[in-house]
């Protein structure tokens, strides 16, 4: 049954899912492997993880683990980050094709060119960047800690990359600094429109609205709360409201309902296909792929030593200031 699932990547029955999950956990114990998963992963993948979290939480866990193998259920830049903070560990990525479109919207060469134009600026990279780009910047941030960290920086000028939505949101909270913001974006978050959210608010006038800062500025204007995935999780499950409209990737719904099933979490219907607020690359990691990767110890993440050394500094600086 397991072999059939691996060959065809067919939709698994509940029994097949349970069987495969047990086998993954057995292998993890046998190989001293830790499985890390982002909130946007499929429910059956989240269920086999030792830890589920957002980018900041996962970076911390990756840096603290004593496991021999890290199986990272997330997109490519997350796996690279795990390798950077744990270069001696074997980091495995269940689907090497699962990249992040936003991370690919800026290159190391473009960062170097920006350095020449803005030599007096502090270069701040969203964690959603490639290892090559991290190696060129001064510090990394996540959506959970960006305002806090940037307020602590001595530089008056900030070059923020690559996410324009997060950059604009942070700039409003840190008005004392000058921002030069790259024009990258997260397609699923940024393509969700003001009009779509207005319609949802009209349909559910009693609902609170929680929005991820990767969303368009006009969408953010309609929010009762703006925060990272983990911050939205805390807000939505504890706010004094029976309904919460949640504008982030639909994978979070699974965790929300597990923590507080007494609330109604409303996600736009357009999330049902690879489009608005549905991350196809996150969903590209399947339970059979996790099983095959761990069983055969394939899809290992490798990076040049000099990139690891240079990219580690901005990540460690972020963790120190968080």
UniProtKB/Swiss-Prot annotation:
Stored SUPFAM superfamilies: NadA-like (SSF142754)
Binding site residues for [4Fe-4S] cluster: 100, 186, 279
E.C. designation(s): 2.5.1.72
GO process terms (BP): 'de novo' NAD biosynthetic process from L-aspartate
Coiled-coil stretches: none
Location(s), subcellular: Cytoplasm
Signal peptide stretch: none
Keywords attached to this entry: 4Fe-4S, Cytoplasm, Iron, Iron-sulfur, Metal-binding, Pyridine nucleotide biosynthesis, Transferase
Superkingdom: Bacteria
Residues engaged in binding iminosuccinate: 38, 55, 126-128, 143, 212-214, 229
Pathway: Cofactor biosynthesis; NAD(+) biosynthesis; quinolinate from iminoaspartate: step 1/1
The keyword Electron transport belongs to this UniProt entry's keyword annotation: no
Gene Ontology CC terms, in alphabetical order: cytosol
InterPro entries assigned: NadA, NadA_sf, Quinolinate_synth_type2
Keyword Ubl conjugation set for record: no
Catalytic activity: iminosuccinate + dihydroxyacetone phosphate = quinolinate + phosphate + 2 H2O + H(+)
One Pfam family named in its UniProt record: NadA
Cofactor binding, per record: Binds 1 [4Fe-4S] cluster per subunit.
Cofactor: [4Fe-4S] cluster
Listed GO MF terms: 4 iron, 4 sulfur cluster binding; metal ion binding; quinolinate synthetase A activity
Family membership noted in the UniProt record: Belongs to the quinolinate synthase family. Type 2 subfamily.
Functional description taken from the UniProt entry: Catalyzes the condensation of iminoaspartate with dihydroxyacetone phosphate to form quinolinate.
Protein name: Quinolinate synthase
Native source species: Aquifex aeolicus (strain VF5)
Gene: nadA
């Amino acid at each position: 049954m397991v072999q059939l699932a691996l060959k065809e990547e067919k939709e698994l029955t509940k029994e097949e899912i349970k069987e495969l999950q047990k086998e993954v956990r057995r292998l993890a114990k046998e190989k001293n492997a830790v499985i890390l998963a982002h909130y946007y992963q499929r429910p059956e993948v989240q269920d086999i993880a030792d830890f589920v979290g957002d980018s900041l939480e996962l970076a911390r866990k990756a840096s603290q683990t004593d496991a021999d193998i890290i199986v990272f259920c997330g997109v490519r830049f997350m796996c690279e980050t795990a390798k950077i903070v744990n270069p001696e560990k074997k980091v495995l990525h269940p689907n090497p094709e699962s990249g992040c479109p936003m991370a690919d919207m800026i290159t190391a060469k473009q960062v170097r060119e920006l350095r020449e134009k803005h030599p007096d600026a502090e270069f701040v990279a969203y964690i959603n960047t490639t290892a090559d780009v991290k190696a060129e910047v001064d510090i990394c941030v996540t959506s959970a800690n960006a305002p806090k960290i940037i307020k602590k920086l001595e530089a008056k000028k900030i070059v923020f990359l690559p996410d324009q939505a997060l950059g604009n949101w942070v700039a409003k909270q840190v008005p004392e600094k000058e921002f030069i913001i790259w024009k990258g974006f997260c397609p699923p978050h940024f393509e969700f429109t003001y009009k779509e959210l207005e319609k949802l608010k009209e349909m559910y006038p009693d609902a609170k609205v929680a929005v991820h800062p990767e969303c368009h500025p006009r969408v953010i204007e309609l929010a009762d709360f703006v925060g990272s995935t983990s911050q939205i999780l805390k807000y939505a499950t504890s706010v004094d409201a029976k309904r919460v409209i949640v504008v982030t990737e639909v994978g979070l719904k699974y965790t929300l309902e597990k923590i507080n099933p007494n609330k109604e979490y409303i996600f736009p219907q357009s999330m049902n296909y690879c489009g608005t607020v549905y991350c196809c690359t996150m969903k590209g990691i399947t339970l059979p792929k996790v099983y095959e990767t761990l069983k055969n110890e394939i899809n290992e993440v490798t990076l040049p030593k000099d990139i690891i050394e240079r990219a580690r500094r901005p990540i460690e600086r972020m963790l120190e200031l968080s």
